[in-house]
């Protein structure tokens, strides 16, 4: 039950000279933390990528290019050598060296964080000299250079000084110096963060690279209400909105004072079913877990009318999908990206075969402020599953509450 969603953004058209500029940016969500190794959360990652950098990064056309590493060589299938960029300074003025890469590797792997996925398969990082490191892997990793883009480097000296050697335990609501302060090597430093109010960026004048554009100061404001966010754009209170509600797209396209850019994202939205617990929590089935039976999972998949969601809920701005890899991403295959046919009667038969002729009841936890139309999509799923005899109780909540519940 997956879908590719559309990337929608709009910005106000302003007539201004091309000198340094301030950008007022709004989106639905706030970040969860400033700790770059704590939470694998899209909004948090998209904000922190301007402050903390990795060894590699993406170009505008989604290709890998050097960042804190200037070059690399694959010595063998399981051995990579990276040459580090010299002369790079952290925001506090301290130099970037191989020690920071080793420290960050050991830090990101700590179990209380959720960013370990970006170093999966890397068993060791070795320092060759101050500006050379080797990455040793468990086996061949063809996407290693892409994975480590989000392996962001923190200053070892700064972490030692501020007692930030350990990753914040977000699930336990821990607060640390690194969860409220930053010290990266990126083009922008974060001056202040007021949770649920605003984040203030300033250009890091000591950045090793060259700014693409003239934006020197940025104020990011999370605005949860779709209507309020769009009104702020039309009133000129913000310059850019990066998660437009689909119902306002046509109106904004027709406005002489705004421009809408759109295209499909590489993110895939999916419904996660608990296949771990022997007894399904928050359900009326006791002593067992229906989702462990592949026929039940297939039935719920078969009961979803993706085309109706695309047409009605998403107003044409989504792509039905059968696999996690999106079009445009290396590894996508049209041959296997074939959506299961919508068949509620077939779903009922599968449920009966699995021992649930009368269906069952369970709780569907759903964020209501993270993805475009997330709660409306969940509402549609509840109705579709009901036609197959499965009763889902919708439990929608802010994403800040959703993540700790899922992690726990």
Where do the model's predicted regions map?
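Structural transition elements
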Residues: 302, 319-353, 370-375
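Gly/Pro-rich hinge or "lid" segments in bacterial periplasmic/extracellular proteins
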Residues: 63, 151-213, 217, 344-345, ...
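Aromatic- and charge-enriched surface segment that lines or borders ligand/interaction sites
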Residues: 70-114, 128, 134-139, 229-235, ...
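N-terminal lobe/hinge region of extracytoplasmic solute-binding protein
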Residues: 26-76, 106, 183-185
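Periplasmic binding protein-like
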Residues: 25, 93, 239-240, 257-260, ...
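Ligand-site clamp/hinge motif
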Residues: 176, 205-251, 294, 382, ...
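Alpha-helical secondary-structure segments
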Residues: 98-104, 132, 186-187, 215-217, ...
């Amino acid at each position: 039950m997956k879908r590719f969603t559309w990337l929608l953004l709009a910005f106000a058209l302003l007539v201004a000279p091309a000198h340094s500029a301030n950008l007022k940016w709004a989106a639905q969500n706030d970040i969860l933390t400033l700790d770059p190794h704590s939470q694998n959360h899209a909004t948090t990652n998209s904000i922190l990528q301007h402050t903390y950098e990795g060894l590699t990064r993406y170009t505008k056309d989604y290709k890998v290019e050097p960042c804190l590493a200037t070059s690399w060589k694959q010595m063998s299938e399981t051995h990579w050598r990276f040459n580090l960029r010299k002369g790079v300074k952290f925001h506090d003025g301290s130099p970037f060296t191989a020690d920071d890469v080793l420290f960050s590797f050991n830090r990101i792997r700590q179990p209380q964080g959720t960013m370990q996925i970006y170093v999966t398969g890397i068993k060791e990082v070795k320092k060759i000299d101050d500006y050379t490191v080797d990455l040793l892997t468990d086996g061949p990793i063809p996407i290693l250079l892409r994975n480590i883009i989000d392996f962001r480097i923190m200053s070892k000296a700064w972490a030692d000084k501020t007692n930030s050697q350990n990753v914040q335990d977000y699930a336990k609501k821990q607060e640390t110096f690194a969860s409220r302060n930053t010290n990266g090597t990126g083009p922008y430093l974060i001056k202040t963060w007021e949770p649920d109010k605003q984040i203030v960026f300033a250009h890091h004048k000591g950045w090793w690279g060259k700014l693409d554009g003239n934006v020197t100061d940025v104020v990011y404001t999370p605005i949860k209400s779709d209507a309020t966010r769009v009104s702020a754009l039309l009133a000129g209170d913000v310059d850019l909105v990066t998660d437009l509600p689909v119902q306002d797209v046509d109106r904004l396209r027709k406005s002489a004072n705004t421009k809408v850019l759109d295209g499909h994202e590489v993110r895939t939205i999916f419904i996660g079913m608990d296949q771990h617990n022997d007894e399904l929590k928050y359900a009326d089935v006791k002593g067992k877990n229906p989702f462990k039976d592949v026929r039940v999972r297939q039935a719920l998949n078969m009961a979803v009318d993706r085309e109706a969601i695309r047409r009605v809920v998403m107003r044409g701005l989504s792509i039905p999908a059968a696999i996690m890899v999106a079009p445009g991403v290396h590894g996508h295959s049209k041959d296997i990206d074939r959506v299961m046919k919508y068949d509620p009667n077939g779903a009922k038969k599968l449920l009966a075969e699995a021992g649930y002729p009368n269906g069952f009841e369970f709780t569907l936890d759903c964020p209501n402020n993270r993805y475009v139309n997330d709660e409306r999509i969940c509402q549609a799923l509840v109705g579709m599953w009901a036609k197959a005899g499965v009763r889902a109780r919708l439990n929608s909540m802010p994403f800040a509450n959703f993540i700790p519940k899922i992690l726990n």
